[in-house]
Swiss-Prot record:
PANTHER family according to UniProt: UPF0461 PROTEIN C5ORF24
Disordered: annotated segments: 60-155
Family to which the UniProt record says this protein belongs: Belongs to the UPF0461 family.
InterPro entries for this protein: DUF5568
Protein name: UPF0461 protein C5orf24 homolog
Compositionally biased intervals (Basic residues): 78-92
Biased composition (Polar residues): 60-69, 94-107
Pfam families xref list: DUF5568
Signal peptide: none
Amino acid sequence: MMRPVSSNNVAFCASGKSSCLSQDPMRGVDQFGLYPTQQSKFSHTVTHKNISCQTQEAINETHLQTSTSRDLDTKSDLKKKKNVGRSGKRGRPSGTTKSAGYRTSTGRPLGTTKAAGFKTSPGRPLGTTKAAGYKVSPGRPPGKKQQALMCSSDA
């Protein structure tokens, strides 16, 4: 800040200059050649935009409405995304082959009919029949039990 300090009737500024511009007898403020249009360029008035409480509440309400609708969308998306990796409720994951041995949607092994009623593996590779000669679950070849009964009846 520059304040005129008078000593011995000579005007001094606090900054140490011999005179202030406002008290300079050589040039007045009007002599600097600033026209009214130029003065408006250099003298800016700062105005602050006041946001009323009503507009802030309206902004908050619209934000709440959009967030709740987003929440509903994400909940429905989560339900859709939950079963993305599977072909059905109990089916095999998508991208796997039938030979991988996944059960069908009814719970029975692939390659079996519904009438067979399998709930576990039949004891032979899936897709094969009993006539192929594979051992069944108890560990004997198919048809062996019938031959044993015939032999015992002959004796």
